UniProtKB/Swiss-Prot annotation:
Stated role: Sodium-phosphate symporter which preferentially transports the monovalent form of phosphate with a stoichiometry of two sodium ions per phosphate ion. Plays a critical role in the determination of bone quality and strength by providing phosphate for bone mineralization. Required to maintain normal cerebrospinal fluid phosphate levels. Mediates phosphate-induced calcification of vascular smooth muscle cells (VCMCs) and can functionally compensate for loss of SLC20A1 in VCMCs.
Family: Belongs to the inorganic phosphate transporter (PiT) (TC 2.A.20) family.
Organism: Felis catus
Protein name: Sodium-dependent phosphate transporter 2
Pfam families linked to this entry: PHO4 (PF01384)
The encoding gene: SLC20A2
Amino acid sequence: MAIDGYLWMVILGFIIAFILAFSVGANDVANSFGTAVGSGVVTLRQACILASIFETTGSVLLGAKVGETIRKGIIDVNLYNETVETLMAGEVSAMVGSAVWQLIASFLRLPISGTHCIVGSTIGFSLVAIGTQGVQWMELVKIVASWFISPLLSGFMSGVLFILIRIFILKKEDPVPNGLRALPVFYAATIAINVFSIMYTGAPVLGLVLPIWAIALISFGVALLFALFVWLFVCPWMRRKIAGKLQKEAALSRVSDESLSKIQEVESPVFKELPGAKANDDSTVPLTGSAGEPSGTSEGTSVGNHPRASYGRALSMTHGSAKSPVSNGTFGFDGHTRSDGHVYHTVHKDSGLYKDLLHRIHSDRGPEERPAQENNYRFLRRNNSYTCYTAAICGMPVHSTFKAADSSSAPEDSEKLVGDAVSYSKKRLRYDSYSSYCNAVAEAEIEADEGGVEMKLASELTDPDQPRDDPAEEEKEEKDTAEVHLLFHFLQVLTACFGSFAHGGNDVSNAIGPLVALWLIYEQGAVLQEAVTPVWLLFYGGVGICTGLWVWGRRVIQTMGKDLTPITPSSGFTIELASAFTVVIASNVGLPVSTTHCKVGSVVAVGWIRSRKAVDWRLFRNIFVAWFVTVPVAGLFSAAIMALLMYGILPYV
């Protein structure tokens, strides 16, 4: 059958297929490296580099099997024997419908399934072309069933693996020995699965025709050799690396403690750059003691009629402002004294130049080293009412172990910090404006953590009528120790690469499956598509996926790697290994499961095991709803394009 007149459709198909591959990379890339980026074991740039290598390799070696299912397993192509151009138009419509919806979802940061998109789009154009008889509904039922089976199976496998790791490694007093013993097993399992997948699924591409027992034997042998290599070389190197890291941290902590204990009470390097302040009588008052100042200067030193307040290790003025010699802005330093005797300072700066400097004020010293009367300082937060940084500075302990020196305070001192009555490890303060922090900054609790300091009014904490969380009942989120982080850091990189390899093999079919059908129809002039999937088309799809990853992949990575549940290297390793194992098995049997479903199932299962409160169930609900929406929406887009081609273009060409 002469179809040379439809070359324009093939060219259009190649362009749309690349856009479709781009959308697959932008959305589904989070399935392979989202958890690795979320746990911090790799940066976004490193993830893009590794994913580019393994996505492309996986697409070339594993993509042919699933691509055949996408091309011929959803609709009966024999019904198009007399209308080849209609099937070609349908393949173009399927790619357009899938690409449009995935690009919209990526823009909305919504992780959806590329498999869902292409299946829905294929059904959509078939309904327009020849009605319901063109759809193999039993195959569709199997595919829909796999959408539920894949997250459940992947979640179950991830959960079991994480429980075993937690029992035998994470919960041990010293997790390193058991972790090092398990390394060869983990690496061997990963290598065995990959080798088996390449030799079994990619055998036609590689020109290998081997029985299954031979493939299994070769895979086991390669895995055994790799396990010996890990045991002899990687484990000793990892042991030295962990020991060196722990020794370095201990040495730095010891040196820091010794250095801080030698700092003079009147000497504060933090303020050496700051000039003197102007008091109300225009007399110059230094913000900190200088080298020439007598070391015996007391905290109660006064200058003129203006008392000098203690400022951590430095002595500072409670009123005035000064022009900074190292910036173009004004460094305001205003004092507010309340009836409780505490001095509150507002620091204004119209640029972020002093952010780090002021951050050091409160962190220069631990509470166990300062007298009970000395001040402690808070982290800076962006003031919502001003384009400057506002810091509330007052005498306030950050740890519950730091007790007030005068336990027999007068009743009016209850206006001060709640002290012993609260835990400083949980509650935090929040202030949003200049006036609110001035009025309430002392009546709060504080916690310094990786995300900064939030603030909550102490009036809420001390009010007996207010409900309060019971720390004993609150489930604590498990966090990896330093040695566990190092141990699983390397493992998660490997499993992320494994996941990327599996993702490329499974999802490249979503991008170039219709393109392969379009090309084979044009080349052979028939709809049966008997030829093997060309390797160069698989590579073309892999390049498109990598392009989408580099340009737009970070949007959905945020959702999968951080928003759904916090990820640590140990949990990330479990998620990656179990979900990738599920995907590879499905790819080998030719079942187009969704890598999104597998990864989401693993993330939720492991997050729920770590802590039920660690999972964002609202986000999970939205993702679950999106799984159902994707098929009909992609089908509608595809049906619209198919109607346009059939009734608006094909009759006139």
